[in-house]
């Protein structure tokens, strides 16, 4: 049955900012969906607040709204655009919850809009835990014994029936937010309290513990004619109790008997029918008791999920694309499989390889957080690898994480450590895989470890096999052909083999290649080689037959950014995808190398060829060799994927690989303190006084010379890893003592810290002769807060023309002095009217997508072409990629104002005592994602950015103010304006006195440190938790008040009210609150903004 003809326009709801539990996979699904809708001739409207996504590029939709995803805002878009239908299944939990709210508020009925891809009844059945329990029973399957509760009293009553431990799961939340395991009454009180708060329906499910059972997922699709396919089975390496997003997962499931698999399949098909998902995909999670074989259905997601992205990349079956076609009325047998072009989508994929996904964590960013893994997801990214067997895929996946200590360690284990390792492995943490493998290496048995961890014995045997292989490599001592072939089949890297045989990596590689032991590249074809594959999507294996086809033109290789992490996220993937698009359009063959299953760059049709490989020197050199053998390589781009490929630049150049764009020498010059200082001197530019220390004595001397406070950090880092502002010698000695390795190769850099400076960020293009300045961003928070966590505004709102001219001149001088070809990002600070250069990065930065969206100029595409020799003049002329005149520093006065705001994951991380980690910002980056607010003026744009970052500003109510002495004078005007608007101001001791002296009514309240009064009057933290305060404004002072402030900020984070910690942000918030009270909120698409901007620029040039 062909597609429906009654739909003319569709509104797609995106997933908003990247947060833990809802990441780049929804940009990948959303981008596919938009493509399908456009191909089918529909008018496409999109709402998504995240500017770092490919889907918000204006060419993917007819009207792109970068606006907060709230029911109120989406209603305004519906009223303006009048779509026929809404597709809410591709934007994660955010989109589903918004669609449900629009249905409940009567908005869908009012504007006669239909939901496609899922109906409300199916969403409710799948997401509402009580209803879903009924579904499972009607299908003749079991779910865990459970109680649904809405209050604390009900929770304690349920505990008597279920007994401890029990699982707590709130309804309608995502990534396990608010869930946990309660081992006793205190846990129950804490976790249920959070859960009731995070659940939009204040409903929580308590269920019997099935800890230690085996966990599986099936990824399904169903069409309206009741055709059902199982796309992929996924098995969790970790047993139940660890969120599937934090577990190592394997596809296809490896430890199920055929009979068990058929049972799961039958139950899944019954459930998907009963729930009524009839135009799309869903995933269903199961648990199996290893002792009795009892099967329990855990939950279902009636939408495209994180697992669907993994299943798509693992099988080559484009779930999101097919789900979108189903929502338009097609059936599975009418949709062709892109890869084979012969089979329809109703053919279930078969795999002749193993896929392993490994999570990447960021606990080093939150030293106070507890690294136990629970049902609340905590990982920030993931890497995926494919191999012909489990050991090969596992070792490749671990190598793809790029974390110190992520690969297995085969050095000998003393006997006395074994018992301790087994004991530690009982508690699931980020190190559990290594503890298990080391315990086995030290002589523990598979039975011992199964007893301790409940990890399936088959997986434990595989780890044992790796240990045995490592022992054989060590025993051999010499690099023989047989030993190397065997080691490679189990995924050992040259580096690991070198460590076991006391050779360095280069020697192993030389011998291996001389013996002709090279990987071959296999193709992901969805059908175990039954049909030919038309899309070259490859993975390496030490097998027999190579499947890389010949290519007529030399290829351009783009190195991706690897797994998402804090400091290197989707923004870098955006630049890689743009480069590939621009180069393909210009007629080049592009090759993408990456190992992140969530991203658009690893979609099989973004580049001419895709290699799903780790980004290590060994793996990248082998891909280059394969491309050389089959048609030659023009060069490699390392400047687009962040720090990951940049680190390989010099080694690749040493191996004779041509680097496109900025040279490795120029990259090194910008990172090297001394050489960069010479560039600044020659240009007459200043940087804050600084020095390089290799010991505490050095550091003390430098700090005394330049004066405290100082900013200390290791060299070569991204995301401010390990940075700190140090105010005195005692803290300096503590920092140096904790810094892992300080050597002459890895010195510590010490800079004068500029207090009260305005930070400025610039992205520019340089081709050797001309410069194009993409945009000048003014940071809202003061210098000292990491640029990735700071809100910023473009065009700048307080910088005069003279400052902008100085920034321009400095940018050009640095780009020329460093020798950039392509993108460069420079951070400046303006203090007492002196312009300081903080740092320069000769690569795509994390602000490139924001600048591109705010100004309508696609910077990464331009940079890729400059790398192949195109000039800025040509880009302004024949290529029409840059404006003919002017640039991002000369935007007219009526250009729209865009505000970028960071989104922080504090509510996910708790200390071992169960408290939220501190939300105070500093020089180390902690945000996982970003949003953009764009409007005619700064105040409304800032208000939009806060609403989009889930921090909507209040327009009435109570505001708590408590600031450090140094800030008291600067906040009086702002507080007075709020008081005049009718807000009640609540304050502690000192601040309250100052406000009263200035004629501002302030209600005094007790500090956290004072505790409750004898009359039972609570502290400010108690008031916040009781929901009596609508916004907290607290700037930290040194010492004791820091802990006072921490309790308060933790309370605000845990109940989700805005918590402002800098004066600059407070002043911006006051402007925004005034605007919210006076102006009607209007929605404008990026396409409309672009038209307004070009009209304004033409008028300015006329």
Curated annotation (Swiss-Prot):
It holds the Pfam family CPSase_L_D2. Mg(2+) 1 binds at residues 285, 299. InterPro entries: ATP-grasp, ATP_grasp_subdomain_1, CarbamoylP_synth_lsu, CarbamoylP_synth_lsu_oligo, CarbamoylP_synth_lsu_oligo_sf, CbamoylP_synth_lsu-like_ATP-bd, CbamoylP_synth_lsu_CPSase_dom, MGS-like_dom. Residues 951-1102 are annotated as: Allosteric domain. It comes from the Bacteria. GO terms for cellular component: cytoplasm. Mn(2+) 3 binds at residues 827, 839. Binds 4 Mg(2+) or Mn(2+) ions per subunit. It catalyses: hydrogencarbonate + L-glutamine + 2 ATP + H2O = carbamoyl phosphate + L-glutamate + 2 ADP + phosphate + 2 H(+). NCBIfam families: CPSaseII_lrg, PRK05294.1, PRK12815.1. The large subunit is composed of 2 ATP-grasp domains that are involved in binding the 2 ATP molecules needed for carbamoyl phosphate synthesis. The N-terminal ATP-grasp domain (referred to as the carboxyphosphate synthetic component) catalyzes the ATP-dependent phosphorylation of hydrogencarbonate to carboxyphosphate and the subsequent nucleophilic attack by ammonia to form a carbamate intermediate. Composed of two chains; the small (or glutamine) chain promotes the hydrolysis of glutamine to ammonia, which is used by the large (or ammonia) chain to synthesize carbamoyl phosphate. Tetramer of heterodimers (alpha,beta)4. PANTHER family: CARBAMOYL-PHOSPHATE SYNTHASE [AMMONIA], MITOCHONDRIAL, CARBAMOYLTRANSFERASE FAMILY MEMBER. This is Carbamoyl phosphate synthase large chain.
């Amino acid at each position: 049955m062909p597609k429906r003809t009654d739909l003319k326009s569709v509104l797609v709801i995106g997933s908003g900012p990247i947060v833990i539990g809802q990441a780049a996979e929804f940009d990948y699904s959303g981008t596919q969906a938009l493509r399908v809708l456009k191909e089918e001739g529909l008018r496409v409207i999109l709402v998504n607040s995240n500017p770092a996504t490919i889907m918000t590029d204006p060419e993917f939709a007819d009207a792109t709204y970068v606006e907060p995803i709230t029911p109120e805002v989406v209603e305004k878009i519906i009223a303006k655009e009048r779509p026929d239908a809404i597709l809410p299944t591709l934007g994660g939990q955010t989109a589903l919850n918004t669609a449900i709210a629009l249905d409940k508020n009567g908005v869908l009925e009012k504007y006669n809009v239909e939901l496609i891809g899922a109906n409300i009844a199916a969403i409710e059945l799948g997401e509402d835990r009580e209803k879903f329990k009924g579904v499972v029973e009607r299908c003749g399957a079991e779910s865990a014994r459970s109680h649904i509760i809405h209050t604390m009293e009900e929770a304690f009553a349920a505990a008597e029936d279920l007994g401890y431990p029990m699982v707590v799961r709130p309804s309608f939340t995502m990534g396990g937010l608010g869930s946990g395991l309660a081992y006793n009454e205190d846990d129950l009180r804490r976790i249920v309290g959070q859960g009731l708060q995070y659940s939009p329906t204040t409903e929580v499910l308590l269920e019997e513990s099935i800890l230690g059972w085996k966990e599986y997922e099936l990824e399904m699709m169903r069409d309206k004619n009741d055709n059902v396919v199982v796309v992929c089975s996924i098995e969790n390496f970790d047993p139940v109790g660890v969120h599937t997003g934090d577990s190592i997962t394997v596809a296809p499931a490896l430890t199920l008997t055929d009979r068990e698999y058929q049972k799961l399949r039958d139950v899944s098909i019954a459930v998907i029918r009963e729930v009524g998902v009839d135009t799309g995909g869903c995933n269903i999670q199961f648990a199996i008791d290893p002792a009795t074989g009892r099967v329990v259905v855990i939950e279902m997601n009636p939408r495209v999920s994180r697992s669907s992205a993994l299943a798509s990349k693992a099988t080559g079956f484009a779930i999101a694309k097919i789900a979108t076609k189903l929502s338009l009325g097609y059936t599975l047998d009418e949709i062709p499989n892109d890869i084979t072009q012969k089979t329809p989508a109703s053919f279930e994929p078969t795999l002749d390889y193993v896929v392993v996904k490994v999570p990447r964590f960021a606990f080093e960013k939150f030293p106070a957080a507890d690294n136990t893994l629970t049902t609340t997801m905590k990982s920030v990214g993931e890497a995926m690898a494919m191999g012909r067997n489990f050991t090969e895929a596992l070792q490749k996946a671990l190598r793809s994480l790029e974390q110190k200590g992520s690969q297995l360690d085969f050095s000998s284990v003393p006997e006395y450590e074994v018992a301790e390792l087994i004991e530690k492995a009982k508690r699931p943490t980020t190190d559990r895989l290594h503890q298990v493998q080391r315990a086995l290496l030290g002589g523990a048995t598979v039975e011992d470890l199964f007893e301790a961890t409940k990890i399936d014995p088959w997986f434990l045997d595989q780890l044992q096999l790796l240990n045995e292989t490592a022992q054989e490599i060590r025993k051999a001592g010499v690099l023989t052909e047989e030993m190397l072939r065997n080691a490679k089949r189990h995924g050992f890297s040259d580096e690991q083999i070198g460590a076991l045989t006391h050779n360095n990596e280069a020697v192993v590689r030389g011998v291996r290649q001389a013996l002709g032991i090279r990987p071959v590249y296999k193709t992901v074809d969805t059908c175990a080689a039954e049909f030919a594959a038309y899309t070259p999507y490859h993975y390496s294996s030490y097998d027999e037959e190579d499947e890389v086809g010949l290519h007529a033109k030399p290829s351009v290789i783009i190195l991706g950014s690897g797994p998402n992490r804090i400091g290197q996220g989707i923004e870098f993937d955006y630049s890689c995808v743009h480069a590939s698009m621009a180069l393909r359009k210009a007629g080049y063959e592009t090759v993408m190398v990456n190992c992140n299953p969530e991203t658009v760059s690893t979609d099989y049709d973004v580049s001419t060829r895709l290699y799903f490989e780790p980004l290590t020197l060994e793996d990248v050199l082998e891909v280059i060799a394969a491309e050389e053998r089959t048609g030659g390589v023009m060069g490699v781009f390392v400047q687009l994927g962040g720090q990951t490929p940049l680190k390989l630049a010099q080694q690749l150049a040493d191996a004779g690989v041509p680097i496109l764009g900025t040279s490795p020498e120029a990259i090194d010059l910008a990172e090297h303190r001394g050489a960069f200082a010479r560039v600044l001197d020659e240009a007459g530019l200043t940087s804050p006084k600084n020095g390089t220390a290799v010991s505490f004595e050095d550091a003390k001397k430098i700090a005394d010379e330049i004066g405290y406070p100082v900013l200390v950090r290791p060299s070569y880092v991204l995301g401010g890893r390990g940075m700190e502002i140090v105010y005195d010698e005692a803290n300096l000695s503590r920092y140096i003592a904790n810094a892992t390795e300080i050597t002459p190769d890895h010195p510590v850099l010490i800079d004068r810290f500029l207090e009260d400076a305005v930070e400025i960020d610039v992205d520019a293009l340089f081709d050797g002769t001309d410069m194009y300045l993409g945009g000048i961003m003014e940071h809202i928070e003061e210098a000292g807060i990491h640029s990735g966590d700071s809100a910023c505004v473009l065009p700048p709102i307080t910088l005069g023309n003279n400052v902008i001219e100085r920034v321009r001149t400095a940018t050009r001088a640095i780009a020329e002095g460093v020798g950039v070809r392509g993108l460069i990002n420079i951070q400046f600070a303006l203090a007492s009217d002196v312009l300081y250069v903080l740092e320069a990065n000769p690569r795509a930065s994390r602000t490139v997508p924001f600048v591109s969206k705010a100004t309508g100029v696609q910077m990464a595409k331009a940079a890729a072409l400059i790398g192949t020799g195109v000039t800025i003049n040509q880009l302004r002329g024949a290529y029409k990629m840059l404006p003919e005149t002017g640039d991002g520093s000369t935007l007219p006065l009526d250009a729209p104002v865009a505000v970028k705001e960071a989104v922080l994951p504090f509510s996910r991380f708790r200390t071992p005592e169960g408290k939220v980690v501190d939300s105070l910002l500093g020089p180390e980056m902690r945000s996982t994602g970003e949003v953009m607010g764009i409007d005619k003026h700064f105040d409304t744009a800032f208000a939009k950015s806060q609403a989009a970052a889930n921090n909507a500003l209040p327009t009435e109510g109570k505001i708590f103010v408590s600031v450090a002495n140094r800030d008291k004078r600067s906040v009086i005007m702002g507080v007075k304006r709020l008081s005049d608007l009718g807000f009640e101001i609540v304050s502690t001791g000192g601040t309250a006195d100052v406000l009263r002296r200035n004629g501002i009514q302030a209600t005094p309240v007790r500090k956290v440190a004072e505790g409750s009064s004898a009359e039972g009057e609570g502290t400010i933290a108690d008031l916040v938790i009781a929901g009596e305060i609508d916004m907290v404004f607290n700037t930290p002072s040194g010492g004791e008040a820091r802990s006072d402030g921490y309790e308060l900020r933790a309370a605000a984070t845990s109940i989700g009210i805005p918590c402002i910690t800098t004066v600059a942000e407070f002043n911006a918030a006051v402007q925004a609150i005034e605007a919210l009270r006076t102006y009607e909120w209007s929605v404008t698409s990026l396409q409309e903004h672009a038209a307004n901007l070009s009209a304004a620029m033409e008028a300015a040039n006329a």
